[in-house]
């Protein structure tokens, strides 16, 4: 059922947006514009606002603490850390090519695992050897932290690498699993929801990381360079 207060807020926000656009401004400030709305109304209104701004050619600055909201509306997103701009980029690049460990851990979901650089684009980890699509300036043998997103881990019944399911969250089309490796390290993985694994079960997994993100481990210094 539709919450009446949320529906009233929806009408109010549409009216406020119409009034703000009436003078045909070149730049519009949107400060938490979708707060107090339920999930479905928030998603629908955010898409409508983006379409309206695009159609009118109006630039806007959106201030929000909601990542999903920022990604849905914005072409470029800035991530701030204690008042400092960490990265200004597209939503895609913020997720797949974070400029710092803070951005990597703040945007989306993911875990860092320790690894050793074997070559400019190859890392040895407890998950095996991972091949990347970029080169790093760190010397071979350097200790690095590898970011793995839930969509980087895929089920593989034939894999020698086994992980134990320690938690699960049903998302509808997919299920988010929390996995524990034999070393005790934990990762998250998204599997199709028709594969209904249970906590305590062992599953075969492998890494399928199209965008390998690597940072120098604490205590080492190196730069990251795209191929």
Language-model segments: residues:
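Single conserved hydrophobic/aromatic residue that forms the stacking wall/gate
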Residues: 1-8, 12
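Conserved signature/switch motifs of ABC ATPase nucleotide-binding domains
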Residues: 19, 23
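Catalytic Walker B motif of ABC-type/P-loop ATPase nucleotide-binding domains
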Residues: 28-32
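ABC-family nucleotide-binding domains
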Residues: 38
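Helical segment within the ABC ATPase nucleotide-binding domain
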Residues: 42-56
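Internal alpha/beta loop-helix hairpins
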Residues: 54, 59, 64-128
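Non-catalytic connector elements of ABC transporters
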Residues: 110-112, 120-227
């Amino acid at each position: 059922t539709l919450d009446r207060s949320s529906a009233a807020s929806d009408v109010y926000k549409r009216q406020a947006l119409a009034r703000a656009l009436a003078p045909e401004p070149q730049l519009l400030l949107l400060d938490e514009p979708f707060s107090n709305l339920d999930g479905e109304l928030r998603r629908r209104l955010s898409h409508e606002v983006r379409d309206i701004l695009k159609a009118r050619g109006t630039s806007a600055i959106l201030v929000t603490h909601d990542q999903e909201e920022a990604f849905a509306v914005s072409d470029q997103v800035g991530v701030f850390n204690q008042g400092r701009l960490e990265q200004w980029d597209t939503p895609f690049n913020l997720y797949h090519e974070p400029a710092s460990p803070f951005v990597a851990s703040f945007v989306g979901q993911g875990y860092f695992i320790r690894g050793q650089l074997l070559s400019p684009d190859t890392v040895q980890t407890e998950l095996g050897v991972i091949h990347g699509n970029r080169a790093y300036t760190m010397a071979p043998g350097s200790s690095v932290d590898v970011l793995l997103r839930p969509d980087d881990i895929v089920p593989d019944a034939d894999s020698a690498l086994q992980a134990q399911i320690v938690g699960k969250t049903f998302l509808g089309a997919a299920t988010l699993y929390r996995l524990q490796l034999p070393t005790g390290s934990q990762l998250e993985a998204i599997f199709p929801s028709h594969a209904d694994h249970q906590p305590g079960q062992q599953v075969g997994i492998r890494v399928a990381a199209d965008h390998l993100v690597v940072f120098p481990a604490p205590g080492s210094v190196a730069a990251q360079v795209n191929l």
